[in-house]
Structure formats: structure tokens, C-alpha cells
């Protein structure tokens, strides 16, 4: 009841809340993305074993972002975070060509999850500052994003350390949240 009243109150006064699940393979830059958005700075990170959760304010939307560790042995725990997720940010290490197939498999499994059927999908093609980074177009093709027909999706080139592209991604999320409301 409290969550319902909070959402109703927020909607009446123009503020919205959006629950975001941020996932991706280990080392993709999820935690760096989260704290660049939250604090505006790059922090020293260690591999996330559990999760980090922060609220990021953008325009009139309060994004509650759950950054969940990406190591293979803890990915089975991701499903515990699916409930009430309105948006997924899937972070890709654009420089890691050897694991793009693994990222595709992980993403495809998530796309088949019933609890995520109404979530919008934002892919951050991260680490674009590195010289061998795959372009957003190449990642789109390798992930098979064009085959996603049942939900809104978008890919955004990003560099978490500089912040490049991060707010453009939040802009897309905020516009798609409005379309779903």
C-alpha cells in the first residue's frame, strides 16, 4: 500500500519513479556507470559480489538503479531482482570481442524471463574510448538486437569514465517510461 501511495503521490506532482536493473558480464563497467551517474565522478571499484543500489535523479524521474554483480557464478541470483523491474540496462564491454557471444546468450535468457516481459531495454555499449571498441552498430548485430520485437530497446554508445552517452541513455529511458505510463 505504501508503494502504491508513494507512486500515486509522485505521479500527481509530476515526479515519477522507475526501477532499473543494471546487469552485464563482469568487468563491463556497471558499477562505474552507476557511480558516474550518482556522484558525477569515477570511483575505484572492485568486482561486485552482491549488489549496489542507488537513486539517480534525472529531470522529473527518480531512477532506483540496482547494479548486480556479473560474475558467472552469481548470475543465477539475478532473477531475484526481476520483480517490478521497469527497465533493464545491459552494459557491454565494447572492447571485449571474446565475450560478446556470452553476453548475447545471457541477454537472450533474460529476454525470455516472464517477470521482465514489460521492461524496456537499454544497452550501454561501454568503453567506447578504447581503440579496439566495437561500434554500437556492430554490437547491435552481434547481440541480435534487431530481432527483439516485443518491447522497446535502444543501444547507446558510452564511456562510463567520461560520462559520455550516459545521460542520453537516461533520456531514452525517461521518454519510454512516459510512453508506458
UniProtKB/Swiss-Prot annotation:
Protein name: ADP-ribosylation factor 2
Family annotation (SUPFAM superfamilies): P-loop containing nucleoside triphosphate hydrolases
InterPro entries: Arf1-5-like (IPR045872), P-loop_NTPase (IPR027417), Small_GTP-bd (IPR005225), Small_GTPase_ARF (IPR024156), Small_GTPase_ARF/SAR (IPR006689)
Misc. comment: Present with 25000 molecules/cell in log phase SD medium.
Cited SMART domains: ARF (SM00177), RAB (SM00175), SAR (SM00178)
Record flagged with keyword Nucleotide-binding: yes
Name of the gene this protein is made from: ARF2
Subcellular location: Golgi apparatus
NCBIfam families: small_GTP
Annotated residues for binding of GTP: 25-32, 48, 70, 126-129, 160-161
Domain of life the protein comes from: Eukaryota
Record GO terms (molecular function): GTP binding; GTPase activity
GO cellular component terms, A-Z: cytoplasm; cytosol; Golgi apparatus; plasma membrane
Cysteine pairings via disulfide bonds: none
Family in the record: Belongs to the small GTPase superfamily. Arf family.
Record function comment: GTP-binding protein involved in protein trafficking; may modulate vesicle budding and uncoating within the Golgi apparatus.
One example of a Gene Ontology biological process annotation: vesicle-mediated transport
Lipid-anchored residues (N-myristoyl glycine): 2
Keyword Ubl conjugation attributed: yes
Positions of crosslink type Glycyl lysine isopeptide (Lys-Gly) (interchain with G-Cter in ubiquitin): 127
Listed Gene3D superfamilies: P-loop containing nucleotide triphosphate hydrolases
Alphabetized UniProt keyword annotations: ER-Golgi transport, Golgi apparatus, GTP-binding, Isopeptide bond, Lipoprotein, Myristate, Nucleotide-binding, Protein transport, Transport, Ubl conjugation
PANTHER family, A to Z: ADP RIBOSYLATION FACTOR-RELATED
Amino acid at each position: 500500500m505504501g508503494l502504491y501511495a508513494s507512486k500515486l503521490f509522485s505521479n500527481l506532482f509530476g515526479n515519477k519513479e522507475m526501477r532499473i536493473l543494471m546487469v552485464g558480464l563482469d568487468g563491463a563497467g556497471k558499477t562505474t556507470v552507476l557511480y558516474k551517474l550518482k556522484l558525477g565522478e569515477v570511483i575505484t571499484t572492485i568486482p561486485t559480489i552482491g549488489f549496489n543500489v542507488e537513486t539517480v535523479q534525472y529531470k522529473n524521474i527518480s531512477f532506483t538503479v540496482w547494479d548486480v554483480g556479473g560474475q558467472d557464478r552469481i548470475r543465477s541470483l539475478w532473477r531475484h531482482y526481476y520483480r517490478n523491474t521497469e527497465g533493464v540496462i545491459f552494459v557491454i564491454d565494447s572492447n571485449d570481442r571474446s565475450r560478446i557471444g556470452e553476453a548475447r546468450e545471457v541477454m537472450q535468457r533474460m529476454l525470455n524471463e516472464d517477470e521482465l516481459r514489460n521492461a524496456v531495454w537499454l544497452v550501454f555499449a561501454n568503453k567506447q574510448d578504447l581503440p579496439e571498441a566495437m561500434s554500437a552498430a556492430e554490437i547491435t548485430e552481434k547481440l541480435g538486437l534487431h530481432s527483439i520485437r516485443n518491447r522497446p530497446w535502444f543501444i547507446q554508445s558510452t564511456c562510463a569514465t567520461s560520462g559520455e552517452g550516459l545521460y542520453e541513455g537516461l533520456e531514452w529511458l525517461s521518454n519510454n517510461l512516459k510512453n508506458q505510463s
